[in-house]
Regions:
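Cytosolic-facing loops and C-terminal tails of multi-pass membrane proteins
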Residues: 2-5, 205-246, 250, 258, ...
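Select subsegments of transmembrane alpha-helices in polytopic membrane proteins
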Residues: 17-31
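Juxtamembrane "helix exit" motif at the C-terminal ends of alpha-helical transmembrane segments
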Residues: 28-49, 185-194, 548
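Hydrophobic alpha-helical transmembrane segments
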Residues: 37-62, 221-234
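Transmembrane alpha-helices and immediately adjacent membrane-cytoplasm interface residues
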Residues: 50-80
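Peri-catalytic and regulatory segments of divalent metal-dependent proteins
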Residues: 73-181, 185
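An active-site-proximal "capping" alpha-helix that borders the catalytic cofactor pocket
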Residues: 100-104, 185, 189, 252-273
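Post-HExxH zinc-binding segment in Zn-dependent metallohydrolases
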Residues: 171, 178-213, 264-267
Length: 549
C-alpha cells in the first residue's frame, strides 16, 4: 500500500475520531437537554401539581448536575511544567546541530528547547491551542539512558521517529484525538472519583451512627455504603462510549507509529532504525535492573555513587561483556505479542519486521555514525550530575558519595551487620559478647541449643526436641556463625566485597580460605563441636603478613 493511501486512511480515521469526540460532548448535552425537555413536557401536559413531579425534578437534577459539572465545567489541570535538565544551544552546540539537521531532514520545525530526562524515552511536545489545531512552542526531551546506551545512528533514528510524527499531514487531527482521549479519560476518572468520595462519606456516616448505637447498647446497622450513586452509573455509561473512541483513536496512533518509523529509516537508515527498535526494550530493562541493583544499592545505608554516576553508571553495566551479550539476546528474541486494539503502539516485533522488509537504506550523509551517542553531549558527567540534583529526592543531598568499589563494599558491609543482628541479639540475651569468639566459646561450652533457641526459626523447629531439634538447629547455627565470621573479617578489613558488573558482589577470599572456611563452619556446629579449625583460620587471617606459620 502506498504512503499516500495510508495517509488517506489515517486521515479518515482521524476525522472519525474527531466526530466521535464531538459526539461525546453531544451525548452529554443530549442527556441534560433530554432531562429538561422531559420535565417541561411533564409540567405542560399535567393539569395539576403532584408529588411525582418533585421526584422527577430531584432525579433529573441528580443526573444533570454531575454531567454539567464534570463534562463541561471542570477544568483539567494544565501541565505547563517541563521536567528535566535544559540543554542550551550555547552549552551543547553538537547536540543541537544534530537535532536541527534531523528536524530539517524530516521537513518539520525544530524544537525551541531540549531537556535531558532520566527515563528511557524521547519525545517532541508542543504547546498547542484549540485541541492541537494551533501549533505552538516545541520541546524535545531526550532520556539520558538513550545517550548512554545507543549509538549516534540509533539515536538519530529515535529522534527522526519523534519528529516524523509532526511530518504527517494529519498531525493536527491526531492532536485532536490525543486531546480527546485525555478529556474523555478525565471525565470518567472524575466521575469515579466523585463516586468513591460518596462511598467514603457514607461509610463514615454509617460508622459514626453505629458507634452512637453501640454506646447506647443498641444493635449496629448492617447498611452498606452503596456503590457511589448516579456518578458511578454515569461513569459506566460514558465508559462504553469511551471504548469505541479509544479503539478508533488508538488505531490512528498505531498507523502513525509505522509512518514515523518510515521517516526514521529514510533519515537514519534501515538497519539503524531496526537496531534502535530492538535495543530500546532491552535498554529499558537494563536501566531498571541497574537502578535497583547498583545505583540505589546503598540508599538504605545512606550511600550513593559519586556525582554523575547515579545515571551515568549505566554505561559501565552496558560495557560488561556478559551483560552486553544478555542485552543482545533480548534484542534478537523480541516477544511475539498480539496487537491490542486499545494500545497506541504496535508490537515492537511487528515494527521491526516492517522496517527490515524495506529496501536497504544507509540514511542521509553525515548521520548514522556508530560512535556512542553520549559523545554528542559536552561534559557529560557534569550534565548527568546536574540531572541527579533535579531528579533525586532532597534527602539524597545528605547521603555520602563513594566510588563504585567502596560503595559496593560499604553497602554489603551494612547488609552483613543487618544479617548478623539475630545472632548478636541471641548472644546478648544469653549474657555473652556479640563476637565470633564468644559464639565459639558458647559452642565449646555446650550452649549450642541455648543459642539456637534464641534465633528466628519455624514453629516446627521451635517445638522439636532431641535429635530432631539438633537437626533443625545445625543449619541455624551454621548460618549464624557464618554471618558473624563474615562480619568480623569485613569489619577488620581482612576481606572485602568486590564489584562486578556481570555478577552479584562477592566477598573476595583467597582460594585457601574459600576452601577451608566451609569445612571449619561445619566442624564448629557438628554434634561434637570442633571450633579449632575456625579459630586457627581467623588467627592466620588476622596475623600480619610474614608472621603466619
Amino acid at each position: 500500500m502506498s504512503t499516500e493511501r495510508t495517509g488517506m486512511r489515517t486521515s479518515t480515521r482521524a476525522l472519525l475520531a474527531v466526530t466521535l469526540l464531538a459526539g461525546f460532548y453531544l451525548l452529554a448535552a443530549a442527556i441534560v437537554v433530554g432531562l429538561i425537555w422531559l420535565n417541561v413536557e411533564l409540567v405542560v401536559t399535567s393539569d395539576r401539581f403532584h408529588s411525582a413531579m418533585v421526584k422527577l425534578w430531584l432525579l433529573s437534577a441528580a443526573i444533570a448536575y454531575p454531567v454539567l459539572r464534570v463534562v463541561f465545567l471542570t477544568r483539567r489541570k494544565r501541565d505547563d511544567s517541563h521536567d528535566g535538565l535544559p540543554l542550551t544551544r550555547e552549552e551543547q552546540p553538537e547536540l543541537w546541530a544534530r537535532v536541527d539537521r534531523i528536524a530539517e531532514a524530516t521537513g518539520v520545525r525544530g524544537p525551541a528547547e531540549i531537556r535531558l530526562v532520566p527515563q528511557v524515552n524521547a519525545g517532541v511536545y508542543e504547546e498547542t491551542k484549540l485541541l492541537g489545531l494551533i501549533p505552538g512552542r516545541r520541546h524535545l526531551i531526550i532520556g539520558a539512558p538513550l545517550l548512554i546506551g545507543l549509538t549516534e545512528a540509533e539515536l538519530d533514528s529515535v529522534l527522526a521517529h519523534e519528529f516524523g510524527h509532526y511530518a504527517n499531514n494529519d498531525v493536527r487531527l491526531s492532536g485532536v484525538t490525543v486531546a480527546g482521549r485525555t478529556a474523555i479519560g478525565h471525565t470518567i476518572a472524575t466521575l469515579h472519583r466523585r463516586a468513591d468520595q460518596h462511598v467514603a462519606d457514607r461509610a463514615a456516616e454509617i460508622a459514626d451512627d453505629n458507634a452512637y448505637r453501640k454506646a447506647r447498647g443498641r444493635k449496629a446497622s448492617d447498611e452498606d455504603a452503596g456503590n457511589g450513586g448516579i456518578e458511578r452509573y454515569l461513569a459506566k455509561f460514558f465508559t462504553l462510549y469511551a471504548k469505541l473512541y479509544f479503539r478508533v483513536s488508538e488505531s490512528i496512533s498505531r498507523s502513525q507509529e509505522y509512518a514515523a518509523d518510515r521517516h526514521a529509516a529514510r533519515i537514519a537508515g534501515r538497519d539503524a532504525t531496526a537496531s534502535a527498535l530492538r535495543r530500546l526494550p532491552a535498554l529499558d530493562a537494563a536501566q531498571s535492573f541497574y537502578l535497583d541493583s547498583y545505583a540505589t544499592m546503598g540508599v538504605g545505608a545512606g550511600l550513593l555513587p559519586l556525582p554523575g554516576q547515579f545515571f551515568g553508571g549505566l554505561g559501565r553495566l552496558l560495557a560488561d561483556p556478559e551483560r552486553r551479550e544478555e542485552l543482545a539476546e533480548m534484542g534478537l528474541d523480541l516477544p511475539d505479542e498480539q496487537p491490542d486494539p486499545y494500545d497506541s503502539h504496535p508490537p515492537i516485533r511487528r515494527r521491526v519486521a516492517v522496517i527490515e522488509a524495506l529496501p536497504d537504506s544507509p540514511g542521509l550523509p553525515g548521520l548514522g555514525e556508530n560512535r556512542p551517542a553520549l559523545g554528542l553531549l559536552r561534559d557529560p558527567q557534569q550534565r548527568l550530575a546536574e540531572l541527579e540534583t533535579l531528579a533525586l529526592r532532597p534527602e539524597a543531598a545528605q547521603m555520602r558519595r563513594l566510588d563504585w568499589p567502596d560503595l559496593v563494599h560499604e553497602t554489603m558491609l551494612a547488609h552483613a551487620r543487618e544479617n548478623a543482628q539475630p545472632v548478636l541479639r541471641a548472644l546478648t540475651d544469653s549474657g555473652l559478647h556479640g563476637t565470633v569468639e564468644a559464639m565459639l566459646d558458647a559452642l565449646d561450652a555446650g550452649r549450642s541449643e541455648e543459642i539456637a533457641r534464641r534465633l528466628p526459626q519455624s514453629e516446627e523447629a521451635a517445638q522439636a526436641t532431641g535429635r530432631a531439634a539438633r537437626e533443625f538447629h545445625r543449619p541455624l547455627l551454621r548460618r549464624a556463625l557464618q554471618s558473624l565470621t563474615v562480619l568480623a573479617l569485613a569489619s577488620q578489613q581482612l576481606a572485602r566485597w568486590e564489584l562486578s558488573w556481570g555478577h552479584p558482589a562477592a566477598l573476595a577470599l583467597s582460594d585457601d580460605t574459600a576452601e577451608r572456611l566451609p569445612v571449619a563452619l561445619d566442624a564448629a556446629v557438628a554434634d561434637a563441636p570442633d571450633t579449632a579449625p575456625l579459630r586457627t583460620l581467623l588467627a592466620e587471617l588476622a596475623a600480619p603478613a610474614g608472621v603466619q606459620s
